[in-house]
Amino acid sequence: MYKFIVYRDKNGKWRWSMQTSNGRIIADSGEGYVYKNSCIKSIKILKENICKAEVVKVDPK
């Protein structure tokens, strides 16, 4: 089971991380939010759109 953890970083900004059942972080917000509601909104947007995401293969040159 996966879960989102919402927390404040050392600068007081709100962030989220997505963790597996064993605590491994597999995704994070990548940026801090001033408002907790903005952080939670970004999780909702991700959850609504993740299944539409395209998988892109990058070939090394």
Explain the meaning of each model-derived region:
Residues Y2-D9, K13-Y33, S38, S42-L46:
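A structural feature that tracks compact, well-ordered secondary-structure segments
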Residues I45-V55:
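Short arginine-rich
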Residues V55, D59-K61:
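Short, charged, surface-exposed hinge/linker loops at domain edges
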